[in-house]
Structures are given as structure tokens and as C-alpha cells.
């Protein structure tokens, strides 16, 4: 039914698809490894930080991303007032809080 030239053409086309499938077999695991080593932990860290910021309350001792220690004096929607020392307060954006060191009991 097919001439020999048509058969050779089909073999060449099949060979090209096979090469594509081999490329996929290499590429898909690389993407999966990248996802589990880079993207997934970063998402988890972002989720934990959002939860920490949501649970901030007056009296918590915190550390900012700039390395400043303070005690939460007042909370706003997007900002927080930290007491750095007695009679010394500063306003920070909530996202600049890196860690809650201890919570008020």
C-alpha cells in the first residue's frame, strides 16, 4: 500500500517523536526535582511567615529583618510599633518582622 519512500518517511517521523519523548523523560524529572528542592520549601516558608505575622500580639519580643530587637507595643493593619528601649519606639512594616522570639504569657 505504501511505497518504500513513504515507509522510510514514517520511520523518520517516529524516530523524531522518540527523541522528543526521551527529552521529556529527562526534562520532567528535572522540573520535579527543582519544584521539591526550591519552590515547595519557599512556599512553605512564606505560609509560615504569614501565619506568624497574623498571630503577632502586643508584648511579643521580635527580631526585624534588619537585626533590630523590640517588643510589640501597638499593631496596625500593615504596620507595628516596636519599643526598642524604654521611651524609644519605632514604626515598622509588619513584613519586616523576621522572628517572634518570645510571646507574652
UniProtKB/Swiss-Prot annotation:
Coiled coil regions in record: none
Pfam family, one: YajC
Localization: Cell inner membrane
Spans through the membrane: 19-39
Record's keyword terms, sorted: Cell inner membrane, Cell membrane, Membrane, Protein transport, Translocation, Transmembrane, Transmembrane helix, Transport
Gene Ontology terms: cellular component: plasma membrane
Disulfides per UniProt: none
UniProt function note: The SecYEG-SecDF-YajC-YidC holo-translocon (HTL) protein secretase/insertase is a supercomplex required for protein secretion, insertion of proteins into membranes, and assembly of membrane protein complexes. While the SecYEG complex is essential for assembly of a number of proteins and complexes, the SecDF-YajC-YidC subcomplex facilitates these functions.
Similarity remark: Belongs to the YajC family.
Subunit structure, as described in the record: Part of the SecDF-YidC-YajC translocase complex. The SecDF-YidC-YajC translocase forms a supercomplex with SecYEG, called the holo-translocon (HTL).
Protein name listed in UniProt: Sec translocon accessory complex subunit YajC
Source organism: Borreliella burgdorferi (strain ATCC 35210 / DSM 4680 / CIP 102532 / B31) (Borrelia burgdorferi)
Gene coding for it: yajC
